[in-house]
A protein has these predicted regions:
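Positively charged, low-complexity intrinsically disordered leader regions
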Residues: 2-77
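A glycine-rich, Thr/Ser-enriched phosphate-binding loop motif common to dinucleotide/cofactor-binding enzymes
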Residues: 50-66, 153-168, 303-307
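Short glycine/serine/threonine-rich phosphate/pyrophosphate-binding segments
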Residues: 61-65, 78-97, 112-114, 161, ...
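A short, small-residue-rich loop immediately preceding and capping a beta-strand
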Residues: 73-94, 98-106, 179-188, 215, ...
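Catalytic phosphate/nucleotide-handling subdomain of diverse soluble enzymes
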Residues: 97, 310-374
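Small/polar-residue-rich loop-to-helix segments that shape phosphate-bearing ligand pockets
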Residues: 102-178, 244-269
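Active-site/ligand-binding loops adjacent to catalytic centers
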Residues: 130-149, 201-301, 345-377
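Glycine-rich beta-alpha junction loops
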Residues: 157-158, 186-190, 217-224, 255, ...
Length: 377
């Protein structure tokens, strides 16, 4: 049932992890506004009227479900996860639902946009007071080495990529064909790489004719290192575009990875090259306008990162990048937060506040404290 009906996922027995997928539908309102005859929306979030019941309001829940199920099948006792927001919420939620232990590391600069479906006291959460998402990744790796709970692995984890690739699986299932274009906002690049890899599987499978969907990927200015590198025609990003100070200027902190999988083999650069794709850079103002446009046309709220994708779609249409009648898949990576919070209680994210320079002894002390609290419950 749910996403587990797809046998291309690296999970054999997902017991105890019921997981619904995205809702994929043919747009009318936004399609009409943009002049697209074949615009399909993959909505990942909470929209009961459409049958979308992802209470974490993010497609990262598919990642978490597949990663946890895969780790459990392979005898992994627990995981350490770094996040700028959505991944933390997804792993915290499924950890509580399944009893599978995770330790989560997040940067304090992202807390204003973060929330859990459960109180943070139930999920060991470490808050980096003096760093960004990339610092959280570094600290999470150290927690992993000391605790023996493997680091979730980021984009290198095939279970993560296959989990995010569920969007393409559901889309092709709903559309009955491959999309000609795929639109998404990117931070680490994992979701875009997942869409590319899953599309390649469809072509190798032979049941779906056509070509690889052209990837149209977007970032939020002024922190848009991949977009800027791509527009320059470079495989390598400019270190100046990865400056941490730029992150404070964007509305989408979840897109703020300074370690994106761009120039590595099989990364975003290769995905764009293989698909004849393009990258776009979207300002905060353009993001806000696109968010309002989507809500007006489709009657549901979306998160800022998804609005970046909507803005990029508008740019692609204006540039004539999409042929008349070509099927377009817009990945709304998160939405329905306002609706969910009207119906369900959510919690601000808190936890142990630590420095990015915490000592190994300090990490050991925190882990011991977490073990004691868990054993007393």
């Amino acid at each position: 049932r749910g996403v587990w009906r797809f046998n291309w996922l690296p999970v054999h027995s997902p017991r105890g992890i019921p997981q619904s997928g995205p809702v994929v539908y043919r747009s009318e309102g936004l399609a009409r506004r943009l002049g697209l005859r074949e615009l399909w929306v993959a909505f990942n979030g909470y929209w009961p009227e459409r049958g979308a019941l992802i209470e974490t309001c993010t497609f990262k829940e598919f990642e978490a479900a597949v990663v946890l199920a895969n780790a459990r099948e392979n005898g992994v006792a627990g995981l350490t996860v770094a996040s700028a927001g959505n991944t933390a919420r997804a792993f915290a939620h499924l950890s509580q639902k399944t009893g599978y232990p995770v330790t989560i590391v997040v940067p304090s600069m992202c807390l204003q946009d973060m929330w859990y479906l459960e109180t943070s006291s139930l999920v060991p959460t470490m808050v980096i007071e003096d760093g960004d998402y990339s610092d959280a990744i570094d600290v999470a790796r150290r927690f992993s080495l000391i605790s023996g709970m493997p680091f979730e692995g980021g984009v290198k984890n095939v279970a993560k990529r296959d989990g995010l690739g569920i969007v393409m699986l559901e889309a092709v299932s709903a559309m009955g064909r491959m999309p000609g274009h795929y639109v998404q906002a990117v931070g680490s690049g994992a979701g875009a790489i997942a869409a590319w890899e899953m599309s390649e599987r469809f072509l190798r499978d032979g049941r779906f004719d056509g070509r690889l969907p052209r990837l149209h990927l977007a970032q939020n200015l002024p922190f848009a290192p991949m977009s800027k590198a791509w527009q320059r025609g470079n495989r390598e990003m400019d270190p100046a575009d990865l400056e941490a100070s730029l992150i404070a200027c964007i509305s989408t902190r979840v897109l703020s990875s300074r370690y994106p999988a761009y120039g590595v083999r099989g990364g975003v650069y290769d995905a764009l090259t293989a698909t004849g794709g393009n990258m776009y850079a979207v300002t905060n103002e353009e993001m806000a306008e696109a968010r309002d446009l989507f809500e007006e046309c489709e009657e549901v709220d979306i998160v800022p990162a998804a609005a970046v994708a909507v803005a990029a779609l508008g740019k692609a249409v204006t540039q004539g990048a999409m042929g008349d009648g070509e099927p377009v898949l817009l990945n709304i990576t998160g939405g329905g937060e306002k609706r969910l919070k009207e119906q369900k209680k959510t919690y601000a994210v808190g936890g142990e506040r630590i420095s990015k320079d915490i000592s190994d002894a300090g990490i050991e002390e925190l882990l011991c404290g977490a073990l004691k609290r868990n054993s007393s419950r």
